[in-house]
Every structure is written in structure tokens, then in C-alpha cells.
Amino acid sequence: MEYKVNNISYKYTTDGPQVLKNVSFSIEQGKVTAIVGPSGCGKSTLVQIFSQVIPKLIGNGELEGSFDVPEGTFVSVVSQNPENQLFGYGVEDAIAFGLENIGMPQAEIVERMEYVLDLLKLQYLRKRSVDNLSGGQRQSVCIASVLAMKPDILIMDEPVSSLDPNGKKMVQDILGELRESGNTTVIVDNNLVWSAGIVDHVVGILDGEVVFDGSRDEFFQNFELQEKLGVILPQEVEIYRALYAKVPDVKMFYNMDQARAELAGRTTAKTRAEKEAAAESFNPVIRVKDLVKQFSDGFIGLKQVNAQVPEGKIVAILGQNGSGKTTFVKHLNGLYKPTSGEVDYRGESILGKSVAQISKNIILVFQHPEHMLFEETVEKELTFCARMQGVDFTEENITEILTRYHLENEKENFPLNLSMGQKHMLTILSVLLSSADVILLDEPTLGMDGFLIGDLEKMVLELKKAGKTIIMISHEIPFVFRLADYTVILNHGEKVFEGTKEELVEREDIFDKINIEFPPVVRLSKELGLDEIVFDVDDFIAKVTES
């Protein structure tokens, strides 16, 4: 059986632009369909139509066409932002909310709750307050609350953007099991890194129109379209694309096993010189001493953490969901006050200062852009930090930033009407005009397509060149290893590693401990016996094709 998307067109206002234009495709029952496309292409609008938010809750637009499913078909959506979907004080309340609203008997609610808590390995969170969970933990609870409903069609709008690699793998495995059981899943996500192994069917949308409708393998071999859509691909596919340009007879691969098999005969193992890590001396711009944080529900988020941040470097804070990463960075700009311990900026304690005072030197960009966007226009949002701090700027500054980051046509628009990726980029841009020399980025790639991530990478490197210190939390491990100079790794609130990424790749025990894998280029550098460990695809291809 197939569910039909029939000639859907949509405008949010009668005189507004056409967001979707004659969109038609089929969703096969029991398969996993991925809908991809750049930020602002209409993907999330399509989700709202599938779930009937449009037109039942948002009814002032113009909708033509239909999503045809048999009567009684139950469609559930995992929202792009879990905070819009979690109701109730505790984790159990959030999971039970939907079940209670359809009048399910208490005994069955308990049974389904136990099932999803076990399925997603969330039993340890069941008595926790939702407010005190990490972003990734909230996203897991959101997924659990929807899976408990046992929908006929499961629609997931960027469902794993805040999850650590282990959490993404778990969701991938669960969706694979659901597919084997005949369940239908639609993944709306421009990041195919986590879902490549389970996706059957890909629909590509560009400027509100369907530009691709075919199999996963057909899509992975269409390099030109991947570029146009700004899709984020598994690093193995990036390696294949780059290698194919030099070695056209290479066979298609999109996972580590396939890459390993295809590349093994094409490289000659060399002796890699063991480099002694030279102890690099630096003046820390931030020093953290014996930091402890205990929350009101008794949970201890940080346990005697000692760390230092080198000035003018890109520093990555890594760890699983709930390891204390966001808790840690919120102490650096004063949003959290420690239960005990000390935070120094340039040798001076920040604990007696207000967030406003600290933000003149250390500024945080939140994980969820809705927490930072409250001005009436994109232009006002962009200049908010500068205006609050009394930093001078010109109209030319504004125009240059908006044009460079493709927001010039949004200047007078309401920020919350932007796509998720654009909203996140705007929050990052808003700190560029501030006086701060330390910028904290919590999951900066959340909701971004490949184009925006490319812009973000260039921005971060330019900020470093200008002498700024960048501290970022990210679960996008290849992204981290391309950019980071220095890493701090947390596990269950404790620091388990601090040092350069070159030192980190020699410590496989650390990544084993936090259950995260090195990027494919690092793993293949080691497994293929390259004479040097590399951190990006171009350097890797240069190594494996050198004569």
C-alpha cells in the first residue's frame, strides 16, 4: 500500500509567496522515506500538512492538494524542537500525556511507558524533571512519547539533532526494527549521516518543488543534486565522492565496512611515526577549578571539574547526552552559579558578576534559537547584543553580515518565521557585533543544512584568526575534528580528558569510555596504515592516492 501526496501547494498568507508548489510523491507502507532539501525549502511546512496542523490549527493560508491516507490512519510527529512537544513536570508525565488524551486505560499506559523507556534506555530518567534534562535527553523523551502512541505513520522532523552519536545509532536501530515490523517512517532531515543505513526512498525538495524522487542509492550517486540540496552526507560518502573524481572505477560505498573493503586494496600500509605529544604551553583565558553543580532535584551535574581554555583556540566540549556539557558552559558565562568551585576569566573570578557584565567578555549562543530570538525584525535581532553593550556599528556592518549569510531579503522579517537553520545562524550572527572575545556555541549546527554549516565553519575559522576564543559543544564529530584545536571530554559530570585532538586520537580508550567513535577519516587513517592521521576528507584522499 502507498500513501499519496497529491499536488500539494501552500501559501501562509493569500498574498504571500508560494512555499510549496504542486508537490506529489508516494510513501510506501513499511518503508523509510527521507525528505531532504535546504533550509527554508518547505520541508517543515509539509510536516505540518501531514499532521493536519495545517489547516486545522494554522488556517489562514491557502492550501491546495491533499495527503491521502485511509480513514483511521494514525499519524504522529516528532517535532523539530522537543520543547514544543513535552508537557508535564516529569519524564513519566511527558510520555503519558498523549496516551491520557486519547483515553487509554491506565494499565495500558503503564505497559507502553515501560516499553518505550526500555526501548530508548531511559529508565534512569523516569523520575527526573523535564526542565533539568539535557537537550539530547529531552529529544529522547520526545521520541519515546511519540513511539508510545504506536502510530501507523511516524513522521520525524530533524529528530536526532541534539542526540549524541550513540543516541543517533539507537534511534537508527529502532527505526530499522520498526521497518522490519512493517511500520512506515518519514524522516524530514537534511542530515543523512545517521539514517543512511535505513533509508529506502529519498524525496528532494528545492524552492518548494520536488526535484528528486527515487531510491537512496540513486540519490547517493547524484553528486550534482546533493550539492544543490545542501544535504549533509555520511563522511564515507564524502570520501567516495572525492575518490571517484580521481579514481572513476571505485565502487559506491556509504558505510565503514564498505569503505574499508573498497579502500584496503588501494593503499599501501606505511609505518606511522609515533609522535610524542609536545606539551604546548599557553595562557588560559578561562580556568575552572573544582567545579561542582547540584540541581534542585538532587542530581549532580558536575563533579569536581578542573579545566582550562587556551586563548585564541577552537575548543570542543565533547561527551554523551547528559554528561554535563551544557551545564559546564553555562557556568562560564554566569547563567549557572556553581554549588562549589571557581571560574576565572583572565585570572579574575567571575562568580560575583552578573550575566550582563560577563557577556561583555564571554557570550553564549543557546542550543535552541527560540531562547534568544525576541526582537521584531531580523535586523534588530542582529544588532541586539551590540546595542545592549554600547558597541558601535554601521549600516554597512549590518548589510555586509546579512548579505554574506544570505539573510539580506529577511532584514525586516520576524525572526521566528525563519527556518530552523536560519534562526540558529541568526543567533550566532547576533554575537559577532558584541564586545566578547570568548564565544560559546552550544550545538551550533542544529537545524542547519550543508550550505549553512559551510558558512559556519568559515566564520569560526575567521573568528579564530581575529584572536577570538571559540568554545563549542557538538555531537557532529567530523565537524569537530575538522575545526577543533583542543578538546575537553566530560562523562557523567566528570572530566575524563583534556588536550589537543592530536593527543586525543591516540587515546581510543577515552572514546570507548564515552561510547563515541572517531570520524571515518581518522578510523580509516589508522586501519589502512597511513603514515599520518588526517582529519578531513581532502587530506585523506591526498594520502590514499599519493603514488
Regions found by a protein language model. Name each.
Residues D207-G208, H492-G493:
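Conserved ABC ATPase "signature" C-loop
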Residues L154-D157, I439-D442:
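Catalytic Walker B motif of ABC-type/P-loop ATPase nucleotide-binding domains
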Residues S129-L133, Q137, F414-L418:
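Conserved ABC ATPase signature
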Residues S51, N333:
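Helix-to-loop junction immediately C-terminal to a conserved catalytic motif
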Residues A107-L125, F393-E410:
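Conserved ABC ATPase "signature" region
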Residues G59-T73, G341-S349, I358:
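Conserved ABC transporter NBD signature motif
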Residues V36-P38, L318-Q320:
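The feature captures the beta-strand-to-loop junction immediately N-terminal to the Walker
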